[in-house]
Amino acid sequence: MNREMLMLVDAISREKNVERDVVFGAVESALAQATKKLHQGDVDIRVAVDRDSGDYETFRRWHVVPDEAGLQLPDQEILLFEAKEEMPDIEVDEYIEETVDSVPIGRIGAMAA
């Protein structure tokens, strides 16, 4: 699939006359939106596409907030004391990420253009 991803990005970049990074960003955003639909709640999803290989990984992430602030968006936030249990060096306004299954590129990449 990674070769297909690169071919797709190159084709869209040439046809639409936009930079490859813009196309990669659109593909990442489309894949993230598709992945969000597979999860319950208003989760925060990030997709990272390797610009050289075309491989991509998908992450669910939580924003670290101060303990005293409480959770305003429970599906997207984690309290600092809970985050430190997983990552002792983490600070407020950083993110904890967990790898989740990636959706297949299929039509999603084409729709991103």
Predicted regions and their residues:
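Charged, low-complexity terminal tails
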Residues: 1-112
